[in-house]
Swiss-Prot record:
UniProt GO cellular component terms: cytoplasm; ribonucleoprotein complex; ribosome
NCBIfam families, alphabetized: L21
InterPro entries, A to Z: bL21-like (IPR028909), bL21-like_sf (IPR036164), Ribosomal_bL21 (IPR001787), Ribosomal_bL21_CS (IPR018258)
Gene this chain is encoded by: rplU
Protein name as it appears in the record: Large ribosomal subunit protein bL21
Amino acid sequence: MYAIIATGGKQYTVSEGDTIRVEKLAVNAGDTVTFDQVLFVNNGEAKVGEPTVAGATVTASVVGEGRDKKVIVYKYKRKTGYHKKNGHRQAYTEVKIEKINA
């Protein structure tokens, strides 16, 4: 059984037992989070949402939080001496999928 969920402006294909990194959520480690934007569920028969599957939820437990590797943003304009270097580290929340309710 697997499902496609939407969170943080992105879509993730998940199965029970999977560990995924999603955009930062305002939760603590050990908490339980429920994703109710389930776009697709396949448990032997496919259920496609319009836009979401009615009554379907995905329950996950929060493993931890962190920050991704640094991405360097470098701006440069020739002949003017203009250059600018900036770094960015995106925060994420790591969750473990416990149950898919469809």
